């Protein structure tokens, strides 16, 4: 579990969804005391995180090994496509950069279309609120928890269980 504590101005938002089955903690940093507009934005973004399950806030946080694996998968898929059979690897890699960017946008919160207004991204929402509130606003970190996630489910085979009980 993670411990959240503000080191200055900002907002710590906690959002529980679906009767507490999904929980989100979000830390938002500001350079001035947070306004109601910033608190509302933090709440809305926490709801967005609960719904869309981003893995990271910013693209710079995505581990290099994830990007390398994703590139390898996309390259293998492209090579297996008969339409690309005669294309050299250099051309395929250029084609794949767009697909890779799309994949990264799906897992990075700041690049996702905002749940309450899909005409803007979460990043644009933060920039808009930052401008209208007259302060710097930055998403610092979040944790999304799902009840039961990470627990091993005991799977029993009914036939084996009956056989054990009957001594066979």
Regions found by a protein language model. Give the residues of each.
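N-terminal assembly/interaction segments in proteins that build large macromolecular machines
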Residues: 1-168
């Amino acid at each position: 579990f993670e411990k959240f504590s503000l080191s200055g101005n900002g907002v710590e938002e906690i959002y529980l969804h679906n009767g507490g089955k999904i929980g989100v903690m979000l830390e938002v940093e500001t350079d001035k005391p947070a306004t109601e507009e910033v608190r509302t934005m933090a709440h809305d973004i926490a709801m967005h995180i609960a719904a869309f399950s981003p893995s990271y806030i910013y693209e710079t946080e995505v581990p290099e090994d994830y990007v390398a694996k994703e590139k390898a998968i996309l390259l293998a898929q492209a090579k297996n496509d008969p339409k690309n059979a005669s294309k050299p690897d250099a051309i395929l890699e250029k084609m794949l950069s767009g697909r890779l960017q799309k994949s990264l946008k799906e897992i990075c919160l700041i690049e996702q279309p905002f749940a309450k207004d899909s005409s803007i991204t979460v990043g644009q929402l933060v920039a808009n609120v930052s401008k209208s509130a007259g302060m710097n606003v930055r998403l610092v970190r979040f944790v999304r928890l799902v009840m039961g996630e990470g627990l091993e489910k005991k799977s029993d085979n009914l036939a084996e269980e009956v056989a054990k009980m009957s001594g066979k």
